[in-house]
Amino acid sequence: MSEKLVLIDGHSILNRAFYGVPDLSNSEGLHTNAVYGFLNILFKLLEEEKPEYLTVAFDVKAPTFRHEMYPEYKGTRKPMPQELHEQVPVMKQVLHAMGIRTMEQPGLEADDILGTLAKRAEKEGMDVSLVSGDRDLLQIASDKIKIRIPKTKGARTEVEDYYAADVEAKYGVTPAGFIELKALMGDTADNIPGVPKVGEKTASELLKQFRTLDNLYAHVEEVTKKAVRESLIANKDLAYLSLDLATIRIDSPVVLDWNEARLGELYTEDAYQLFRKLEFKNLLGRFEQKETKQDSLTAKIHVTSDLADAQEIFEAVKKAGHCGFAVLSDQKKCRKIEETEFCGLALCWGEEQIAVLPAEGFLTAQWLCSQLSDLYLAGIGLSTFEIKKAYPALLSNGEKDQDSCGTKTLFDVLIAVYLLNPLKNDYEPEDIAKEQLDRMIRTRKQLFEKLSLKEAYAQRPEEFYEYAGTLAYVCYAAMPVLSQKLEEAGMQKLFDEIEMPVSRVLYEMEKEGVLVRRQELQAYGDALVDRINELETKIHEAAGCEFNINSPKQLGEILFEKMGLKGGKKTKTGYSTAADILEKLAADNPIVADILEYRGLTKLKSTYADGLADYIEEDGRIHTSFNQTITATGRISSTEPNLQNIPMRTELGRLIRKVFVPKDNYLFTDADYSQIELRVLAHISGDEQLIEAYKSDADIHRITASKVFHTPFEEVTDLQRRNAKAVNFGIVYGISSFGLSQDLSITRKEAATYIEQYFATYPQVKTFLDKQVEDAKQNGYVTTLYGRRRPIPELKSSNFMQRSFGERVAMNSPIQGTAADIMKLAMIHVWEELHRRKLNSRLSLQIHDELLIETNRAEATEVAELLKDKMKHAAELSVSLEVDLHTGENWYDAK
């Protein structure tokens, strides 16, 4: 088997990491996000590639031979941001501490070093993986050289791989042809001129026809487009100059003994101390990892399909009193066990006690789930990863407590790590093992690539057992660690009394789903098409020609060149036709108003009329997924499909709600909190004026307008009320004078005056908001009324815009997060009361501040009363929580 060499383009990957990972810095103020992102990519590569050799090449500041050929080379590049620049020497220091060979050479770019080493290694029989964000290196790809282009977003890294065949499949040219493609089309990033009037599409077509640059110029008279032909002839020198500039040198005078690049012990004492200084707590666990630790864990996994053996295991779990478990099923939605591809259970009830029970023979899915459910009913402590997906099994023998969510003995490690670090993009078991237990476990992808669990069990049983057993172990071992951290952070009560119970409520809501009339949805879509076609005809007539309304380029040319409308902003790719540009022109230009309506309707058609139809299941219902661990503020989100962003601004958008209906003999009861965030602000700020305004039970926006604009309450105009409303809600989100000026179409000075007058009216609100910012700067986070933490790393940024964003987050998160917590409490109390009274009505949807119940007609009055009561009394604030309640035959009528 060939040895493997991994080559990394240092500056390129560091740059990708810098822009892909949110701003991070240590307590000394040193920016670290690029280094952190680079290391995550590096570790991922090492785990996937397992190379014998590794080298990282960096660019040097000095000019290269390309600058001698063309002084303007890379002349258009912006300077490296200071926050990134300061991390380059730190990155090199980290690599040196880990014993990783780095290279840089005056006169050469990193690409030339990498290209030379890659081709040399290929000749010597090695397999090569070259990692860079620069697609110029695709010209180096071959059957033995793989170009890997990572994309980093937050802590998540995905990689595109290209061998020679992949380059040709993607770009229609060979790797060698990729250089000639650049020679013709140029490269704005590197300021390679190329041939004027030849873009990527034209260049690709020319190379498909003529194969090479030399052959193209030998037959240049055969180029059919006159303008292109003339440009090619006039700019032949530029074409060949660009070819030279784009060509990576694979014969550079680079000296490297492969032994210098051979990987040794990465986790050295020097590297450990550096990681500590950089405060990479999540990565420190790697220094205590040895391969034997993983081996020792897998050796403890006991696999059995024997009924008697399995019964003994469940008895042992009962005696232990607590276990970690994994339901081995790939279901994406909450379903009955018989509707899922259930493969078995994994249990861990001690450091040495791990069992995997495949669903085969006498160990049927029903029997295994029944045994797990018995553990739950017996009050055994059970911890798992993503509890919602485990509820079908846990509840297969019925309810533990009919009157409550019954989650006191359950622990979801996913929810726990989310509360401790709500800024992560995703949470995986291997991350929990690494961060909480200092253990390395192999990822699902490493074990069986993209196979489903059912496929893995059939094709790679040993890897399946390893995955299942280690997952159960992580759920068992992480629980006490996470519990202690939640306690220390003051979030144990939040976890026990809000997050765990609401997970049960969300499971039931997903399972119930909401009924949708497919025929009415189709009719709604047809009506949209009719109006879209009318608008298209009208727009073309007004323009005097037919064009693609959906093409920003064509639309910009029609509006700002052909029709001569004023206010156009030209960019590199043409005129901007963004909504904010067009909205300013709509009042005076009917065609623009029609275009905006056209855009809105086409979005309604694609996203809702067509999009929702794809999610209607066999039962006629849409079963959305409610996400509990996505938003940093604690709000619940909805996906597949997103039912929380059903349009409300236009009547035609609102009409989509008519297709959502209750089942026969039922109606919808809809309750919506009134101004919950403003009421929360009044309570947590303690502002007496704002509290009194709410206690007066008068129009809060009219009261604010009266006070801010020094106008008697009865004489407040509609405009003053609208402006006061914008200020009221804007303050909650830390709005600036600029933001308010844009919202109200007033000057920045006027907006600043409004805000000053608002704070003069409600001084304790200003004091509260300022204190939130100061506390966040000192602690690194803000908290809700219920203890939920929202970290704000942006406050340590040297970038003014980032810091300003952080300040707005510090002001808003305690308010929005508290409102989200109150809504969750309301959902829990409503759900429990429906069950306590043994009613048939069920919660269907949660949309921000709104709850929708599918209500049995015989229970309508009782449900309306209990829904309003439980929402009003979900929290005891210094101002009352008010609820608007409606009923209807569909969601539209109930709203």
Please provide the spans of the model-predicted regions.
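Short active-site loop/helix that positions an aromatic residue
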Residues: L14-G20, L138-D143, L345, K388-E399, ...
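Function-dense linear segments that define catalytic or interfacial modules
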Residues: A346-E351, L420, Y427-L447, Y467-G469, ...
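C-terminal polymerase-core module
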Residues: D530, E534-T537, E541-A593, A760-R808, ...
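Active-site-proximal helix-loop-helix substrate-binding element of RNase H-like nuclease domains
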Residues: R101, G154-K182, K300-I301, E338-C343, ...
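Noncatalytic, basic helical substrate-engagement surface that gates or grips nucleic-acid strands
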Residues: M1-V131, R135-D161, L238-L241, T247-V255, ...
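Conserved "right-hand" nucleotidyltransferase catalytic core of DNA-directed polymerases
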Residues: N235-A359, A378, L451-M648, L667, ...
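Conserved catalytic core of nucleic-acid polymerases
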Residues: K511, A609, H623-T624, Q628-T631, ...
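Non-catalytic nucleic-acid-binding/docking modules located in mid-to-C-terminal regions
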Residues: S2, K50-T55, I100, K123, ...
